[in-house]
Structures are given as structure tokens and as C-alpha cells.
Amino acid sequence: MTATVMKINLARRERQVLEGLADGRTLARVASDLTVKTGTATGYLRHARTKLYGASETEAALAIAYATEAITLPEPLDPEGLDLSAGQRDLVPLIARGMSVTEIGTELKRPLDVIRSDSQQLLRNLDAKNRVHAVTRLWQYRMLTADQVIAWLR
């Protein structure tokens, strides 16, 4: 059973900035594509994160946006053939929460070089351009779900 949360309404530009980042583009590229200054796009992102339960990191804001359907959900992908190690799988919820390598290392009680290596390999396996894009890919592969994200919000 899927838990529900309050519907979040993002302004058009807030949604466009978040969706652009979700595709793996940089904030500067998203701003250019929207023909606004990077500082303006940063402001839109800041407002969106505030609306998305005050998410401090863009990865978490994106996960919350997907869970609350505040932005367009990405098309699902077939997870067959996606081969992630246990170490990489452990990173999934922590990256989606926007935790840093240091925070993840502390949480999992693992050396930082192992966390960095697993993180880089996870992004390669997901064919993700960056950590924000990884959240999209994890959602597409159904390794990150609305129920998981909503559980963090409670």
C-alpha cells in the first residue's frame, strides 16, 4: 500500500529547473536552456527545495518531487541486467537523501575511499551523469520508490 503525502505544487520555472537537473544537466546548462541567469535558476531551485519539505540537497529534493509527483515521473527502465554490488546497493537511499561521502562513510562505517569507489561505480552502472541524475535512474529502475521516500519524511 502506498503512503500518501500532501500534494506539492511547484511553480513552472521551479519544476523546469528540477526536471532539467533530473536529466543530468548542470544548473548552468539548465539556466541557459531556460534563457535565465544561473543565479535566477539557483533561486528557483532554492524555492523548490523549500517547498519539497525543506530538502537541503538537490538529490533529496528530486526524490521527494518524484514521490509526491510534483514533477513529471521518468519512464521506467527494465532492471534486468543491472548488476550492482551490495556496497553499491547500500548507497542508494543515502545518495537519494543527499548525504555526502563523509556522511555515508560514517553511516555505513566504511572507509571513505571504499564509499567513493562504490559511488563512482554505481553512477557508471546506472549510466548517470551525476548524483542528481542517479536519483532519476534509481527511480526508473524502481530501486527508489515513493514509499521509501515518504518513510524518510515521517
What do the predicted segments below correspond to?
Residues 2-12, 71-87:
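Regulatory hinge/linker segments at domain boundaries
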Residues 21-25, 92-99, 138:
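Short helix-to-turn junction characteristic of helix-turn-helix DNA-binding domains
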Residues 1-2, 59:
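N-terminal flexible/basic segments that precede or flank functional cores
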Residues 26-55, 100-133:
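Recognition helix of helix-turn-helix DNA-binding domains
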Residues 53-79, 124-154:
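Basic, Lys/Arg-enriched C-terminal extension of HTH/homeodomain DNA-binding domains
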Residues 15-16, 89-90:
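Pre-recognition alpha-helix immediately N-terminal to the DNA-recognition helix
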